[in-house]
């Protein structure tokens, strides 16, 4: 049974004098208090109130401002609007304009509303009938290109081609580029107000939008904010990934609206790169939605002319000229602060960054992602973590740094954190590693040459600990990281090497230690410091074979992430249809599950 913090009663119902008040005042009253007996929470700042009201109206949660009524709202309507936004965004549904809600409102996103926009005259929503193209062959062209971008015209066109191909690969739609002025899908890079009713707002905020199919002159047109720093395989892990945003917007252009499903490409918030354009596949629920509109693509039309795919990436002299950030580590020449299996995937943390491997050990990106952009709620000044693990009792993720720890539900920090590590009966000073051993379902914490055994189900430390390391013969007495993997084995990391202990065993498997960089992070022997000679196949006992590069995917000296780390897929790993590929989303708790807002939300 989950332990939940006690919660007071909700806000009291409004009395006659509160039933209708000007919205800013009502926000202060409704959002500054959590319960009738609780102490008032800090009142939102005036600029936050203004942001909240404008944002909720802009994206369909509240009617737009009406000067004839003074924009009056009831407390109930306002609380419902905030609750709906929180549910759609994967936050705890409190109905309160708290810090997490404001942070999500400030996250870059698509310009289109999440819900059918309300009006003052009609407060009941009626979901519009889905629109779709009544033809199968659609033309497209890039009418205007980004003006001050390191991405060349050919790269932009290539990214548009592959983003459209994501949809035509599974649905009976054929996209072809045209050079003339007439095209079904016109693509523009614009700034500020560009006369379509969806003005852009500078860097961040709204980054792009597209129009649904129909008979209007803008049907299918797709616009990107030219004030954004558009990137592709950026070396500094910053900017807006153009391919990821384009896939989302072209979903609108063929008729799909926003959804709250956790790993859908059609969630409204920007979540970062989605991987290699030549290998990216849509999450399952997005496939189902487009199949419902157009049916399943069975074969290529015999009358369709073959179109030569553009090359990716572009030559080196047309890539980003921005210097790489000095604090970004290289995966092939470092040890890691923490390693964890989360939702069946491997996360390697170093400094403010992390790398991610899917269930079948595909490296999502050769470049690391920023930790704070993925795990919402970690302090911005946090420059590293000590240990991370996923609790087996409730599948929440625990981060440790020094004397404090944080608990996350999916990508969002739980209320009330950070808390002291003394909650675990651990001494002050932090830990070196943490992992849950599959053999006994206990969590082990390591510090220097000591280890503790903890029961996450009862939230108590087992008696008799700490004990002297190591429990497993052959494992170093001091560790950097530890993790259990989907194959049932436990993996221990120190420096640039790792040790493998098979499920239920108390000693290291033969042939270890081996190179972490080579076997997990797709580094060659010449790249990984301290790498060792190849061993036999993992099925025979020692380690997995070295990672493999797809040789056809190295172009113009530019390393492309179509790579697989050493081991074959663990038993029961999902196939490519259900494996989550978006960099900034957690996969579902069970393979193939449609992880909807009612279950566990995170875009």
Swiss-Prot record:
The active site is at residue 249. InterPro entries: Hemopexin-like_dom, Hemopexin-like_dom_sf, Hemopexin-like_repeat, M10A_MMP, MetalloPept_cat_dom_sf, Pept_M10_metallopeptidase, Pept_M10A, Peptidase_Metallo. SMART domains: HX, ZnMc. The keyword Oxidoreductase does not apply. Disulfide bonds join 332-523. PROSITE patterns: HEMOPEXIN_2, ZINC_PROTEASE. Expressed in brain, leukocytes, colon, ovary testis and breast cancer. Expressed also in many transformed and non-transformed cell types. One of its GO terms (molecular function) is metalloaminopeptidase activity. A lipid is attached at residue 565 (GPI-anchor amidated serine). CDD domains: HX (cd00094), ZnMc_MMP (cd04278). It is an enzyme of class 3 (hydrolase). The keyword tRNA processing does not apply. The conserved cysteine present in the cysteine-switch motif binds the catalytic zinc ion, thus inhibiting the enzyme. The dissociation of the cysteine from the zinc ion upon the activation-peptide release activates the enzyme. This is Matrix metalloproteinase-17.
């Amino acid at each position: 049974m989950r332990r939940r913090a006690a919660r007071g009663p909700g806000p009291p119902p409004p009395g006659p004098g509160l039933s209708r008040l000007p919205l800013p005042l009502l926000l202060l009253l409704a959002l500054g208090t959590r319960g009738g007996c609780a102490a008032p929470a800090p009142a939102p700042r005036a600029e936050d109130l203004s942001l909240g009201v404008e944002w909720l109206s802009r994206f369909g949660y509240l009617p737009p401002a009406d000067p004839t009524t003074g924009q009056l709202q009831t407390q109930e309507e306002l609380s419902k609007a905030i609750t709906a936004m929180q549910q759609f965004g994967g936050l705890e549904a409190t109905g309160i304009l708290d810090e997490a809600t404001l942070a999500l409102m400030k996250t870059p996103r698509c310009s289109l509303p999440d819900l059918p926009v309300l009006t003052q005259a009609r407060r009941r929503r009626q979901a519009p009938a889905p629109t779709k193209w009544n033809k199968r062959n659609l033309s497209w062209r890039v009418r205007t290109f980004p003006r001050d971008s390191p991405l060349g015209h050919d790269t932009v066109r290539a990214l548009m081609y592959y983003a459209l191909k994501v949809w035509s690969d599974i649905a009976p739609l054929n996209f072809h580029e045209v050079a003339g002025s007439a095209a079904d899908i016109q693509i523009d890079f614009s700034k500020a107000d560009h006369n379509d009713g969806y003005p852009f707002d500078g860097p961040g905020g709204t980054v792009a939008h597209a129009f649904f199919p129909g008979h209007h002159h803008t049907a299918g047109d797709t616009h990107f904010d030219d004030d954004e720093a558009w990137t592709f395989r950026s070396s500094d892990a910053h900017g807006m990934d153009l391919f990821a945003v384009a896939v989302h917007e072209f979903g609108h252009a063929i008729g799909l609206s926003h959804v709250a499903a956790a790993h859908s490409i059609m969630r409204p918030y920007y979540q970062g790169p989605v991987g290699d354009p030549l290998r990216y596949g849509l999450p399952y629920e997005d496939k189902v939605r487009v199949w419902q509109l157009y049916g399943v693509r069975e074969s290529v039309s015999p009358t369709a002319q073959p179109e030569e795919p553009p090359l990716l990436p572009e030559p080196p002299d047309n890539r980003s000229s921005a210097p790489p950030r000095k604090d970004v580590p290289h995966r092939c020449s470092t040890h890691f602060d923490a390693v964890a299996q989360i939702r069946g995937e491997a996360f390697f943390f170093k400094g403010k960054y992390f790398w991610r491997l899917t269930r079948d050990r595909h490296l999502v990106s050769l470049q690391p992602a920023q930790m704070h952009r993925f795990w919402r709620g970690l302090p911005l000044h946090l420059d590293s973590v000590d240990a991370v693990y996923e609790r087996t009792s409730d599948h929440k993720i625990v981060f440790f740094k020094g004397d404090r720890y944080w608990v996350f539900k999916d990508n969002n920090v739980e209320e009330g954190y950070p808390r002291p590590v003394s909650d675990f009966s651990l001494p002050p000073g932090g830990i070196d590693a943490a992992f849950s051993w599959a053999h006994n379902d206990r969590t082990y914490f390591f510090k220097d040459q000591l280890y503790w055994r903890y029961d996450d189900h009862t939230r108590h430390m087992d008696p008799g600990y700490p004990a002297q390391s190591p429990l497993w013969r052959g494992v170093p007495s001091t560790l950097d990281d530890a993790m259990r993997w989907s194959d049932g084995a436990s993996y221990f990391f120190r420096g640039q090497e790792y040790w493998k202990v098979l499920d239920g065993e108390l000693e290291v498997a033969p042939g270890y230690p081996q190179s972490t960089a080579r076997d997990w992070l797709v580094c060659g022997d010449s790249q990984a410091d301290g790498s060792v000679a190849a061993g036999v196949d993992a099925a025979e006992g020692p380690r997995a074979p070295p990672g493999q590069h797809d040789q056809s995917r190295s172009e113009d000296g530019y390393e492309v992430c179509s790579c697989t780390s050493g081991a074959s897929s663990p038993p029961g790993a999902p196939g490519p249809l259900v494996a989550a590929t978006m960099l900034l989303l957690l996969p579902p708790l069970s393979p193939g599950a449609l992880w909807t807002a009612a279950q566990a939300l995170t875009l």
